[in-house]
């Protein structure tokens, strides 16, 4: 079962939490869910170059709080914060609520499954050899602290007549282990021969405490430790 199911969905409530964090009455639930889908589609389309990892939506009383996890926050913020203010106004119009917009920098995009998948998809669109793209991504992830990674590419790879699936794995990726902190991401490459799908699983170690926010907290702590060690090296 662990081989088939989305590994993030399998671990919700154990060491992962939802990207939409709000409660609603039965009558409002459908409307708010559609709003979330529209917000994510709008931001993904508007910020194609910003390397967005995920979008978290929270709804405190009559408000909306959107948090964008991005590897290139400067593109979203713009000169003197002009672009982020435009985005905030558009989101307020879409939700008819007072909307706040937060940006969280992803300091290690090389071990973020969604960003790895996007990078490989971009390389496939530029006609880079798929094996080379996969191998590069695997080496970068393992070098920066991932305990295991698996990448699947499927479709008419290299312009082949018959579609197929190729995969590459290094280290451990224990999909059945619920305490395993596994990040999962997908992307599509629109090539001249058709669409190629990319799936990425990244194993970041085990989380022993039963806490749905553990994975997110761990990522932030890891980023802070990485930035402080970089500062120490610079001072030395």
Curated annotation (Swiss-Prot):
Output the superkingdom of the source species: Bacteria
Write out the GO MF terms.
Answer: mRNA binding; rRNA binding; structural constituent of ribosome
The chain positions of domain KH type-2 read: 39-107
Task: Identify the Pfam families for this entry.
Answer: KH_2, Ribosomal_S3_C
Keywords per UniProt = Ribonucleoprotein, Ribosomal protein, RNA-binding, rRNA-binding
UniProt entry tagged with the keyword rRNA-binding? yes
Cite the PROSITE patterns for this sequence. Answer: KH_TYPE_2, RIBOSOMAL_S3
Q: Where is the stretch described as Disordered?
A: 214-236
Q: Name one GO cellular component term.
A: cytosolic small ribosomal subunit
One GO biological process this protein is involved in is:
translation
Give the signal peptide, or none.
none
Q: What does this protein do?
A: Binds the lower part of the 30S subunit head. Binds mRNA in the 70S ribosome, positioning it for translation.
Q: Which family does it belong to?
A: Belongs to the universal ribosomal protein uS3 family.
Subunit structure, briefly? Part of the 30S ribosomal subunit. Forms a tight complex with proteins S10 and S14.
- Please give the name of this protein: Small ribosomal subunit protein uS3
Q: Which organism is it from?
A: Brucella canis (strain ATCC 23365 / NCTC 10854 / RM-666)
């Amino acid at each position: 079962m662990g081989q088939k199911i989305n590994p993030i969905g399998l671990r919700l409530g154990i060491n992962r939490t939802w990207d939409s964090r709000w409660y609603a009455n039965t009558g409002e639930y459908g409307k708010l869910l559609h709003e979330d889908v529209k917000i994510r589609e709008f931001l993904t389309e508007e910020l194609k170059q910003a390397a967005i990892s995920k979008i978290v939506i929270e709804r405190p009383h009559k408000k909306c709080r959107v948090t964008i996890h991005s590897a290139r926050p400067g593109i979203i913020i713009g000169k003197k914060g002009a672009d982020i203010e435009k985005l905030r106004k558009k989101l307020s119009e879409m939700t008819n609520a007072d909307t706040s917009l937060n940006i969280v920098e992803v300091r290690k995009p090389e071990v973020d499954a969604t960003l790895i998948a996007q990078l490989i998809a971009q390389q496939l669109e530029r006609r880079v050899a798929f094996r080379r793209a996969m191998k590069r991504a695997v080496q970068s992830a393992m070098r920066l602290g991932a305990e295991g990674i698996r990448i699947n590419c499927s479709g008419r790879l290299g312009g082949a007549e018959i579609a197929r699936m190729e995969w590459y794995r290094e280290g451990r990726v224990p999909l059945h282990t619920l305490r395993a902190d596994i990040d999962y991401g997908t992307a599509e490459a629109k090539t001249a021969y058709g669409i190629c799908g990319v799936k990425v699983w990244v194993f970041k170690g085990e989380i022993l405490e039963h806490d749905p926010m553990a994975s997110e907290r761990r990522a932030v702590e890891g980023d802070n430790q990485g930035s402080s060690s970089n500062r120490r090296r610079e001072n030395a």
